[in-house]
Amino acid sequence: TTMAPPIIIDGQPSMSDLSLEMFRKRLTKKPEEGTHEIQPLSGSRIHGHLNFAIERNYDPEAQIMGMELEGIDIAVLFPTMGLYFIARDNMDPRLSLAICEAYNNWLYEFCQHSPDQLKFAAMLPLHDVNLACAELVRCVNELGAVGSFVRPNMINGHFWHSNYWNPLFEMHQDLDVSMGFHEGTGA
């Protein structure tokens, strides 16, 4: 069976925003009462104390409010669904760069609401290692990025242990910033 595409609310996807019916269809056997923790997927939300973020459309002030509520002083913001858009083999490197530049510029502006508390990891155009290096330099030197974040998957035939990526690893070292790897939102 084909699952419905995820619902994206202004770039902020959430598993709790998906249709409960989609998950009911996948459940082959109803769990016995009391044997499993049941968490809502719709209606009242899993983290109801953060509903103000939805009401504020996930704006920077909502981010700060949530951080204060959770006792978090500084946050490094990472890409979510954006990583999937640029992880396609054979994407034109210029398109990948344009997407990354637009995203990084937007996230920089988002962080300017409270630059001492909000930091970001740059999204890099991985279809050309030289473009990735240049975007990393721009993001760190001009926008204040504190690192980068990439998916661990092979792209255009290059695994991460390939020498192809050495210039990017060296650029991170030269700039004294870290590189984060994560499969993505649902991992």
Model feature map: region roles:
Residues T1-A187:
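Helix-coil boundary/capping segments in enzymes
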